[in-house]
Amino acid sequence: MEKNTLIQSPVSLQRRRLLLAGGALLLSPSLALAGAQREETLSDDVASVMRGSINNVNPPRLVFASAQEGERWLSAMSSRLARYVPDEGERRRLLVNIQYEASRAGLDPQVVLGLIEVESAFRQYAISGVGARGLMQVMPFWKNYIGKPSHLFDIRTNLRYGCTILRHYNNLENGNLYRALARFNGSLGSGKYPNAVLGAWRNRWQWG
């Protein structure tokens, strides 16, 4: 698909970024459990609420009772994330975005960290065999329902969509996180994916 030209098309540039970011990600073992959210019909009210969440953009920041607590969290999580993201500055920026987007969606940031580990191993340009994209493996069809054409490989865009979608599923399941996680993965009825996410959370991402 990539052409040998000095001026590359957006598709070829995206292809190059995918390859540079992690090789042949479609074959990566880290994406073995990455599934696909199932396309569904949303009520106008639900779609409106989700669109409002997607479009409400404020600068990311740590959401803690004190700056000291936030710095302790950031330092601890940065050490744990180093195996996936070697650059310290990149780790800290990513963690601030994750903590902010999860918190604003009413989700536990630690569970979201576990989910991202399972979905993409923190690879920004990960893409699954069914087309799910980015850190939280968001299916592109969601843009038609709750957003506008966006670059789902952008870290903040991906986290905003992913956290909004997971919160939607959690609401749909009346706060049952286990079932919400299965819905997020498109595998409702199977415990493999929720157990993997909750296992990653318990083993590597618990806090406090």
Regions found by a protein language model. Give the residues of each.
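Catalytic glycan-binding domains that act on GlcNAc-containing polysaccharides
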Residues: 36, 56-208
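Cleaved targeting-peptide boundary
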Residues: 35-42
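N-terminal targeting leaders that direct proteins to extracytoplasmic destinations
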Residues: 42-56
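Onset of an N-terminal alpha helix
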Residues: 12, 43, 47, 71-74
